[in-house]
Amino acid sequence: MPTEADTCRTLVLPKLYAAGWTDEQIAEQCTFTAGRIVVQGTKATRRKGKRADYLLRYTRDKVLAVIEAKVEYKKPADGLQQAIDYAQILGLKFAYSTNGHGIIEFDLITGKETELDGFPTPAALWSRLRAGENLKDDAQAERILTPLNLTTGKIPMNSPRAWTGGANAKKT
């Protein structure tokens, strides 16, 4: 019986590659929250954190979308609510659920759910994000793509976005 990992490896990744995503842009099995601490008596344990099957990055520091993959025999939409929840936590605008055959997209900018034949290209997704976030000025869009300064550990002061280790934070 196939597993979710089989679906990811044999069905989802080839579709991402076909859409032009590269290994550098595809982050697999990303834990983006620490697990909840549960106290029982005098002992405290940490549960597992939330883990996205895939995060799609436009650049190293700019995550555009989350994908929740389900095993092949489930419906493509079975993981959509989970993907939407993850996208909201991460401040992302695009959530996808797939069983490797069908793909369901939820656009958090428009609130629309769409069934797709394939994943959008990185450029198409970035273009849609720019349009949805009203980033018409190329200079402003470039500032959003400016990476964290790893030497100083600071974000450039003229950058309009905040950075978190797992993905993009919501604008403040």
Annotated model-derived regions:
Residues 1-66, 70-172:
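ATP-dependent helicase/translocase motor core
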